[in-house]
């Protein structure tokens, strides 16, 4: 219901192209954090301290207390105020790949970044410009690449502090094997099987066999 309040402001099925979406609660949160920074700057403190004040306003202020109340009411207190207040970020080494001459850096497995790496590595095997922007073939390739990347991400990705992610997952060689599963004449009917990056196999032997594409994927050329 709390999501419907925002996404279905005009009623279910009544959102149209150009509908104005107003997230008042998010606006209040951002202003709350801005006010904390301004109070810090008004005291003559440097901007770095002001930024920390905005951060603490979120993790140690009323928003954190609201998170605590919500989880106690709906999710048996799985996240608490103490969890919020005790959280501290850290510096991470970014993931890296290349795409047609460009260097691409993303955050690690706790973010959406690795999915981008997987997708770009597969897309590099296709000449998207030759396919033509937004043509049926162009959209088909991108949609199939997204499906393959999401299948692998559901199997292998997670916070690297708690999940061992095979380093081979991000290699170009593995992406090439996965891209071979794409049939230009038929789309995946369901989520495709996850692969086996450690052994450079397009499909892992333990993956579900509900794969409904061609029984034998055409060799990628």
Where are these regions (language model features)?
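Flexible, polar/acidic helix-loop-strand segments at domain edges
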Residues: 114
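Protein kinase glycine-rich loop
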Residues: 118
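Internal maturation/activation junctions in enzymes
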Residues: 12, 23-25, 30, 44, ...
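Noncatalytic scaffold domains of N-terminal-nucleophile
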Residues: 1-53, 58-111, 170, 181-186
């Amino acid at each position: 219901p709390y999501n419907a309040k925002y996404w279905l402001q005009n009623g279910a099925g009544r959102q149209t192209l150009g509908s104005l979406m107003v997230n008042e609660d998010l606006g209040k949160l951002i202003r709350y954090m801005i006010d904390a920074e301004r109070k810090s700057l008004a005291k003559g403190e440097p901007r770095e301290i002001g930024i920390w004040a905005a951060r603490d306003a979120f993790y140690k202020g009323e928003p954190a207390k609201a998170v605590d109340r919500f989880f106690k009411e709906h999710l048996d207190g799985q996240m608490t105020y103490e969890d919020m207040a005790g959280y501290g970020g850290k510096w991470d080494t970014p993931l890296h790949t290349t795409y047609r001459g460009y260097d691409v850096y993303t955050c690690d497995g706790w973010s959406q970044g690795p999915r981008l790496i997987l997708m770009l590595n597969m897309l590099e095997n296709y000449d998207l410009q030759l396919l033509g922007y937004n043509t049926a073939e162009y959209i088909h390739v991108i949609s199939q690449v997204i499906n393959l990347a999401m299948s692998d991400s559901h199997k292998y990705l997670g916070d690297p502090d708690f999940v061992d992610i095979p380093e081979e997952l991000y290699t170009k060689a593995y992406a090439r094997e996965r891209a071979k599963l794409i049939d230009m004449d038929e789309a995946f009917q369901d989520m495709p099987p996850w692969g086996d990056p450690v052994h450079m196999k397009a499909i892992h032997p333990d993956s579900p066999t509900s794969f409904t594409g061609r029984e034998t994927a055409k060799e990628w050329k």
